[in-house]
UniProtKB/Swiss-Prot annotation:
Keywords: Mitochondrion, Repeat, Transit peptide. Belongs to the PPR family. P subfamily. It comes from Arabidopsis thaliana. This is Pentatricopeptide repeat-containing protein At1g03560, mitochondrial. The keyword Repeat applies.
Length: 660
């Protein structure tokens, strides 16, 4: 039988790419093949390969939308499933170097172009929201399509993605594009932009959107107001946020709990905790119940102000109202009570937390352990550490470091070293605070060589040596009369390590130099400190004045004290410290001269100075003189004769007493 073959006919393919260099190509199992000499049409009967001839003029690419048009099938377009094109485009957005060329090839192959609505929808998708670089590349690629222009929603969607990544530079560029094209503002776009700009505190862009809303007759919603205020507060424009709040109070849209929380947060950030507290009470009088966020914001602000009493009061309010107290709030309240030395109250809050079903974390245990350790109750701190471990919590390096610090301050260095080795065994990274506590403890125990080895070990382990570590070792050197080593370490501190020499560093070294009678070197060190602009503390001047007074240079100490006054440094207790030092050294006459100097400057001598002098006289066997000074009419450097107040010098009284 004769076998007939039907001649294939040419059909334009609407969803296949055009072969530019060939008049025809091979199509096999859904794929296109190149036409070359190795491909023979005779093999088509056995391999299901057929010739397909393309038309010389393909139809134009079709714009695709994120949802299929089913308006003729359903009445409502809500809850529509995305078009299959969406998932295919998302699969191509892989961030690779060939991503854009893959997108080009795909669109050519299927004769499609992505509409602005499609681009906006893809940018909003969960797959892209946390990939700002891919979103940016896709946005830039899509605008290269022929006859394509981004709409406002595309820009808004991109800003939202970039805001999550806090990419302010790109957001500013996109914002300038929006302004340039003068899109008419919509409610949804305005709200989204205000939210994004507000998160980043971009006030200029925020106010531009606000003006565009007014120009387009868009009425702000409560949502809009809240995000506007949040943006102003984030940028520390608290006064502006306050004015917006006042507009809301007098307008149609009233503040809600979010508005109040934002305003309270603004006051707290600006350090106006009292105004924040007033706003909290005002909120309650207007029928708005404070929530967990309100109280948490206030507790954090009060803790930062060291107003621990208010922290406790706010916590008690939360407890009474049945508001869930977050772990961080418990940590702050317990920490505040511990800092005030109210360890029993802190422990009560801790137990109350557990009783109410809240599980403590490592941070809360650490706060309480630190409180016990700093108060000298090291045994209680260790017991709490063991309880923490028994309950399944693993102490971190901070927990161990506060225990070690407490042990070292109580002279229990061996136990501290045991915990140090435990941390190493557990693979915990020892921090500089941990090392400085051990170095200080070893130094005070006279184990200076071990302290020095530990100091050098820090560098080997890659642990940064801060001023606390240097100060601990310098203090160890000076206390054991190794002043030269202390001076060498002091120089190395700045020259090699670039570590700041603090006023405490100078205080330690000054004290050590004076103890070794290296007075001139100490004075040069003092001058160096002043030249560097480091303000001396009372302790620092005490180290200097004590050294000078004991070496008979009281006038020099007084002169230096006078030089500090123009610098704005007023050390009220400085003269008292010097008098105390002289009295302890038995130099009563010099102490009296110094007391007279106080009255000559127009200041009254505190009664406690007379007490110091009386005690000094009694200790050197001048009990009769001490009694006369105690019962004399001189109170604080003055003698009263009826209504007349006459200045009396201490030296005169002293000479009179000696003469009698």
């Amino acid at each position: 039988m004769r076998r007939f073959y039907r001649k294939p006919f040419s059909v334009p393919l609407l969803n296949r790419p055009h072969c530019s260099s060939q008049s025809h190509c091979l199509y096999k199992n859904g794929d296109f093949l190149s036409d070359d000499s190795k491909c023979s049409p005779l093999s088509s009967s056995r391999t299901s390969v057929r010739w397909v001839f393309n038309s010389s003029s393909l139809p134009p690419p079709e714009w695709i939308e994120p949802f299929n048009d089913v308006s003729d099938l359903v009445k409502s377009n809500r809850n529509l499933l995305p078009s299959p094109w969406v998932s295919q485009i998302l699969n191509l957005l892989d961030g690779s170097a060939s991503m854009e060329s893959n997108l080009d090839g795909f669109c050519r192959k299927f004769l499609i172009k992505l509409s602005p609505n499609f681009v906006s929808f893809v940018l909003k998708s969960d797959e892209i929201r946390e990939k700002p670089d891919i979103a940016w590349s896709f946005f830039c690629w899509s605008r290269k399509q022929k006859k394509y222009t981004h709409n406002l929603e595309c820009y808004v969607s991109l800003v939202d993605v970039l805001a999550l990544a806090k990419d302010v530079d790109r957001i500013r560029f996109v914002s300038s594009e929006i302004k340039k094209f003068e899109f008419p503002m919509t409610v949804s776009a305005a709200n989204a932009l205000i939210k994004s700009f507000g998160k980043l505190g971009m006030v200029e862009e925020l106010l531009w959107v606000w003006r565009k809303m007014k120009e387009n007759g868009i009425e702000p919603t409560l949502y809009t107001y809240n995000f506007l205020m949040n943006g102003l507060v984030s940028a520390m424009f608290v006064d502006s946020a306050e004015r917006v709040f006042e507009v809301m109070e007098s307008g149609r849209i009233k503040p809600d709990i979010v508005t109040y929380n934002t305003m309270i947060k603004g006051y707290c950030k600006a350090g106006q905790t009292q105004k924040a507290m007033e706003k909290l009470r005002d909120m309650e009088t207007r029928g708005h119940e404070a929530d967990k966020i309100t109280y948490m914001t206030m507790i954090q602000a009060c803790y930062a102000d060291s107003d621990f009493g208010s922290c406790v009061a706010l916590y008690q309010e939360m407890d009474e109202k049945g508001i869930q107290v977050p772990p961080h709030a418990f940590s702050l309240v317990i920490g505040g009570l511990c800092k005030e030395g109210k360890l029993n109250e802190g422990y009560t809050v801790f137990e109350n937390m557990i009783r109410k079903g809240s599980k403590p974390n490592v941070a809360i245990y650490t706060v309480l352990i630190d409180g016990y350790a700093k108060s000298g109750s090291v045994e209680d701190a260790i017991r709490l550490l063991h309880r923490m471990i028994d309950e399944g919590f693993k102490p971190d390096v901070v927990t161990y470091s506060v225990v070690v610090n407490g042990l070292c301050k109580n002279g229990r260095v061996e136990e501290a070293l045991d915990y140090f080795h435990t941390c190493r065994f557990d693979g915990l990274a020892i921090n500089s605070m941990f090392y400085s506590s051990l170095i200080d403890g070893l130094g005070k125990a006279g184990r200076v060589d071990e302290a020095e080895r530990l100091f050098e070990e820090m560098s080997e382990k890659g642990c940064t040596r801060d001023s606390y570590c240097y100060n601990a070792l310098i203090d160890a050197f000076t206390k054991h009369r190794k002043v030269d080593e202390a001076i060498a370490l002091f120089k190395r501190m700045e020259e090699e390590e670039g570590c700041d020499q603090t006023v405490y560093t100078y205080t330690i070294l000054l004290s050590g130099m004076f103890k070794e009678h290296r007075n001139e070197e100490a004075l040069k060190l003092w001058d160096m400190m002043i030249d560097k602009g480091i303000t001396p503390t009372a302790a620092c001047f005490r180290a200097l004045s004590t050294g000078l007074c004991l070496s008979g240079k009281v006038a020099r100490a007084c002169k230096i004290l006078d030089e500090l006054a123009p610098m704005g440094v007023i050390l009220d207790a400085a003269c008292e410290d010097m008098i105390n030092t002289l009295c302890k050294a038995g130099r009563i006459k010099e102490a009296c001269k110094l007391a007279d100097g106080i009255t000559e400057r127009g200041r009254e001598v505190p009664g406690r100075i007379r007490t110091v002098m009386i005690n000094a006289l009694r200790k050197v066997g001048k009990a009769d003189l001490a009694m006369k000074l105690m019962h004399s009419k001189i109170g604080i450097g003055y003698e009263r004769m009826g209504s007349v107040k006459r200045r009396v010098k201490f030296t005169t009284l002293l000479e009179t007493c000696f003469d009698s």
